């Protein structure tokens, strides 16, 4: 699959088979991620791979509780509050692996650089027949001292992109895209 095909085929996947993702496949995704450009070539990222399902279940519970305790009435939609309150909802969708991309240090564009690495990772996963989903629900709690400690992250690391990876149960259907506003100047 060429890069343009991966761009147009990549979709968020939230339903996975139980088949584990092999170490070499996960390493290949990380190898592609670190090919991303970065400001001043600082490459300010680190990667944490988690396949321990009881740990992912615990992080899911902690992240949901954290989000609910910090949710603002009128700001956090009721639909999201209800989802987070559901004991059966696991924020990682029982995926076989989580790859967390964290920014190392306080470089001015470290977060943006990690986002570029994340897109490389997700496109490479698509090209390899794997599915991914960026789990925004996990970000805030993973950035707390307790969240960092759960994964052995140093205090200087900032969790940016928690991405689940697995073998999709079914092919992701195409999704309509909005027409972008484009301004041509000159």
Each model region followed by its residue ranges:
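Small-aliphatic-rich amphipathic alpha-helix that forms the alpha element of a beta-alpha
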Residues: 33, 99, 104-149
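A generic structural signal for short coil/turn motifs at secondary-structure boundaries
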Residues: 16, 107-111, 172
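Short, well-ordered beta-strand micro-motif
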Residues: 49-51, 100, 164
């Amino acid at each position: 699959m060429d890069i343009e095909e991966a761009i147009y085929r990549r979709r968020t996947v939230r339903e996975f088979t139980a088949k584990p993702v092999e170490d070499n496949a996960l390493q290949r995704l990380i190898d592609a991620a670190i090919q991303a450009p970065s400001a001043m070539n600082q490459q300010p990222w680190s990667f944490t791979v988690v396949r321990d399902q009881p740990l992912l279940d615990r992080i899911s519970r902690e992240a949901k509780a954290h989000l609910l305790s910090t949710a603002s009435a009128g700001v956090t939609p009721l639909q999201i509050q209800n989802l987070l309150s559901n004991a059966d909802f696991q924020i990682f969708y029982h995926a076989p692996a989580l790859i967390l991309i964290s920014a190392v240090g306080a470089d001015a564009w470290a977060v943006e650089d990690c986002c570029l690495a994340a897109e490389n990772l997700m496109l490479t996963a698509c090209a390899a027949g794997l599915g991914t989903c960026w789990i925004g629900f996990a970000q805030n709690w993973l950035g707390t001292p307790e969240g960092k400690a759960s994964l052995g992250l140093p205090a200087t690391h900032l969790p940016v992109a928690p991405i689940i990876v697995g073998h999709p149960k079914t092919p992701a259907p195409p999704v309509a895209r909005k027409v972008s506003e484009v301004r041509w100047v000159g």
